[in-house]
């Protein structure tokens, strides 16, 4: 949680460990406590949620128990509250602060505990008719594959999330994993197969969305310099035309703060979108 000014500068930030407690009650309690301490002079509150959001309502979440159409009514404040997918929040921060809104069509794919994406088409936020746009983590890449928390089988994030990579390699952190890649042939082979699956999903995403710039975010982006060219080559192998193969692609710059900063921008972007609609 953070207090952010209109320029995207973080004034203060608090980190809450919710790994062992992901209930709505706990999350609301922490939000309300933070709002009570930091609401003076605040014009809007933005919240990023790892799930499907439509019209400021939580439609579905996969990895936390937070399905509540009236969630924002339980936040004790008179300040306007805006909800959006957490990947979309990160997208807005990178698009506005790093890329200065210069691309017409833009996407950021977050690769961490799960996989999600935020989309900007014609310089406008795109959530889709029902809020499902960007739910790339639940795109099936293996028919009858691994069971996903969403109820489907073979979902992209079951093969290409950071959680899956660490699980297969039997390590706790990406830092530990990449320390082993160069010296351990078994771990190197795991990473090669992992990049195949990551490239599969990313190639599908590129073909469907045809954006001007694709940014890779999430914890995997911190180590991007170790595999960027290998990943690009694997993606190119799965695409059939030159234009798709030449898509601009890079790693996010804002790290863990991207979602916080982007959430602070939600009121501006969503109000603009509503005016256009």
Which ranges hold each PLM region?
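Hydrophobic "anchor" residues
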Residues: 10, 53, 58, 125-126
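Short, well-ordered beta-strand segments
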Residues: 2, 46-48, 215-217
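Adenine-nucleotide phosphate-binding core of ATP-dependent small-molecule kinases
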Residues: 14-42, 156-158, 164-232, 247-252, ...
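Short glycine-rich anion-binding loops that position phosphate/pyrophosphate groups of nucleotides
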Residues: 50-52, 112-114, 220
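Glycine-rich phosphate-binding/hydrolytic loop that grips phosphoryl groups
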Residues: 4, 85-96, 222-277
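Glycine-rich phosphate-binding loop and adjoining helix at the ATP-binding site
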Residues: 19-32, 36, 41-45, 51-105, ...
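Glycine/GP-enriched mid-protein hinge/lid loop-to-helix segment characteristic of carbohydrate kinases
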Residues: 2-8, 14-15, 23-24, 80-82, ...
């Amino acid at each position: 949680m953070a207090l952010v000014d209109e320029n995207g500068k973080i004034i203060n930030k608090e980190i809450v460990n919710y790994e062992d407690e992901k209930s709505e009650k706990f999350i609301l309690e922490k939000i309300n406590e933070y709002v009570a301490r930091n609401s003076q002079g605040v014009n809007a509150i933005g919240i990023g949620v790892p799930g499907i959001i439509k019209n400021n309502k939580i439609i579905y979440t996969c990895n936390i128990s937070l399905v509540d159409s009236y969630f924002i009514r339980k936040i004790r404040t008179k300040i306007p509250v805006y909800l959006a997918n957490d990947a979309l929040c990160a997208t807005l921060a990178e698009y506005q602060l790093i890329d200065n809104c210069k691309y017409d069509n833009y996407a950021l794919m977050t690769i961490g505990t799960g996989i999600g994406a935020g989309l900007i088409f014609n310089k406008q936020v795109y959530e889709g008719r029902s809020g499902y746009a960007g739910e790339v983590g639940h795109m099936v890449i293996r028919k009858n594959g691994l069971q996903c928390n969403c109820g489907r089988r073979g979902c992209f994030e079951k093969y290409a999330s950071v959680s899956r990579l660490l699980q297969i390699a039997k390590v706790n952190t990406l830092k530990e994993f990449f320390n082993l890649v160069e010296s351990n042939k078994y771990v190197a082979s795991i990473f090669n197969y992992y990049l195949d699956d990551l490239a599969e999903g990313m190639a599908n995403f590129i073909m469907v969305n045809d954006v001007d710039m694709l940014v890779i975010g999430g914890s995997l982006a911190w180590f991007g310099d170790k595999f960027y060219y290998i990943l690009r080559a694997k993606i190119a192998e799965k695409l059939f035309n030159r234009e798709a193969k030449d898509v601009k692609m890079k790693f996010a710059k804002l790290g863990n703060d991207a979602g916080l900063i982007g959430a602070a921008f939600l009121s501006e972007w969503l109000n603009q979108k509503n005016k256009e609609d």
